[in-house]
């Protein structure tokens, strides 16, 4: 179960994310693997879990509960951010995803954002995905609904992110304490090879260019460093 946290403000949208995956599944850190898009690449299926385009639009995809991994007859969910990032705004990206057939994919959550708006998108295996604008404030999403405090991870960590400035969010992502259901940074060696494999910090301010930082490993081990701009060139 991946985690993504957003702070949505009049000054912009600020994002922190941990990617949880089987440690044996190969991936590459963010780069310009696609024209005008900077993001990590899943080597197995060729898509991405989180990426940023040259227009300052971010798209991320998360598995919903009990849907880890591929399934026969289903397309890779990693192509969904790439579809969204053909667009020039979060509004247009949300509209593009809601025109798709959700039945082509295993169940998914998506987060779409730019400096002016953020959306939660759910795809539940039938019909078309549904997009919901996220209000100002702090929002945490994992494998279910936004800010669902019935989920132990959200119940524990949402108040911590809400109380901390964005400059401290990288340290919060690194927290591996607590029982498994509440852990934000999961040690793969202690969980049958499944755990937190990398992390992202992304600022989308209205008044300046995006700032994209990436930790190429669990965030208590790997340092955050700047990665490619998605701008042309």
Predicted regions and their residues:
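N-terminal nucleophile
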Residues: 1-233
